[in-house]
Amino acid sequence: MIRIGTRGSLLATTQAGGIRDALRAKGHEAELVIVTTAGDQSAAPVEQIGVGVFTAALREAIADDVVDVAVHSYKDLPTAADPRFVIPAIPPREDYRDALVARDGLVLGELPAGSVIGTSSPRRAAQLRALGLGLEIRPLRGNLDTRLSRVSNGDLDGVVVARAGLARIGRLDHITETLEPVQVLPAPAQGALAVECRSEATDLVAVLAELDHADTRAAVTAERALLAELEAGCTAPVGAIAEVVESIDEEGRVFDELSLRGCAAALDGSDVIRASGIGTPDRAAELGLAVARELLDLGARALIGR
């Protein structure tokens, strides 16, 4: 029996349940084990309670042999590798975009100046401020249904959350606008899951690798390499999105390229630096480093710390 560790929220158990079902479909017995994390018990803003707070307890549960596998929202994982663990599977990614859930069915451009928007993410807050719409951005915690209720009960005019999360718990009908990357660039690895286990568990690594999706792995590798090179944590005002796209060479042959867009924003919205690049999926990390270095040359490090 493969024991899959997960946080107890509806979103987390839905994500982990998808991995359990995928393993069962391939003939492997699997079950969910709920692990309580410090992040779930704190009401403080994410940037105050520490990078990787939601993932640390799951990793310790693996190390203590309470569970065999942990399913993480990949964007929550620290960029620094932990040699005790390996990620054999990054399943196909959900929609990576952010989504607005606003009162009265409004889109961003229809919200009057002074409207109060809640978000858990400094990255979203910085980019929303940079749009120059005069919105008031407030920090937001709680599970997705709690965040949505802040709009329906009139506490907030809107919230911005990951579209993937709403999709996974069946709440897409609440979205009033899906935000394109040109408006708000998503977090590195947003919409992707990381399926993690002990490095030395070679048989389990082979089983989990059956669920891996090569294009998603390439994209996430580039995005997280960019984040790591900027020496920015998962709560920093940094956005990145990579996509595998088909191209045609001069002789008419189709081949895959990897495109990457990245940005760094001042938290007050006063400036956003953008850079992009194209590489190949098998050199995803190098592409991430190259785009990060372009951002650094443009002044990203000072901007992130502003």
Swiss-Prot record:
EC number: 2.5.1.61
Class of the enzyme per the UniProt entry, highest EC level: transferase
Manner of cofactor binding, per the entry note: Binds 1 dipyrromethane group covalently.
Keyword annotations from UniProtKB, A to Z: Porphyrin biosynthesis, Transferase
Alphabetical list of Pfam families matching this protein: Porphobil_deam (PF01379), Porphobil_deamC (PF03900)
Pathway in which the depicted protein is active: Porphyrin-containing compound metabolism; protoporphyrin-IX biosynthesis; coproporphyrinogen-III from 5-aminolevulinate: step 2/4
GO MF annotations in UniProt: hydroxymethylbilane synthase activity
Similarity remark: Belongs to the HMBS family.
Function in brief: Tetrapolymerization of the monopyrrole PBG into the hydroxymethylbilane pre-uroporphyrinogen in several discrete steps.
PANTHER family: PORPHOBILINOGEN DEAMINASE (PTHR11557:SF0)
Designated name of the protein: Porphobilinogen deaminase
UniProt organism field: Mycobacteroides abscessus (strain ATCC 19977 / DSM 44196 / CCUG 20993 / CIP 104536 / JCM 13569 / NCTC 13031 / TMC 1543 / L948) (Mycobacterium abscessus)
Name of the gene: hemC
